[in-house]
Design a protein with these regions (language model features):
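Active-site pocket-lining/capping segments in soluble small-molecule metabolic enzymes
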Residues: 1-26, 44-48, 53-101
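Short, acidic/polar
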Residues: 26-33
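Short acidic/polar active-site loop segments enriched in Thr and Asp
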Residues: 41
Length: 101
């Protein structure tokens, strides 16, 4: 995600809820707190987190948390589809990314 654009939207439209997706690779409390401090309303956590890690983040932040309960897991870093597309020649926009099911 474009953090610069997100910050501009937060400044210009303070009532617009901004969500951080898996492409922001938020996989720990520090990442969730950083987005919270920047003004994001919700974060979608990285897919590979355990239920215990998700619980810890939920209990220690005020930002809304969203997570995947089931689905394909990226072979590369979750949400970093460009790297996967460079390795395998598959486009993230065509939904033909390399995943582990």
């Amino acid at each position: 995600q474009d953090l610069g654009l997100a910050m501009k939207l937060i400044r210009e439209f303070p009532d617009l809820p901004i969500h951080g997706s898996t492409q922001m690779t938020v996989h720990n409390l520090n990442g969730a707190l950083e987005l919270q401090d920047l003004g994001f309303k919700r974060v979608v956590l990285a897919r590979e987190l355990s239920i215990n890690e998700i619980d810890y983040i939920c209990k220690n932040t005020k930002i809304e948390i969203e997570c995947f309960a089931h689905g394909a897991l990226c072979i590369s870093y979750s949400g970093q589809c460009l790297f996967s597309s460079m390795l395998g020649g598959r486009s993230r926009k065509s939904w033909k990314m390399r995943t582990a099911l």
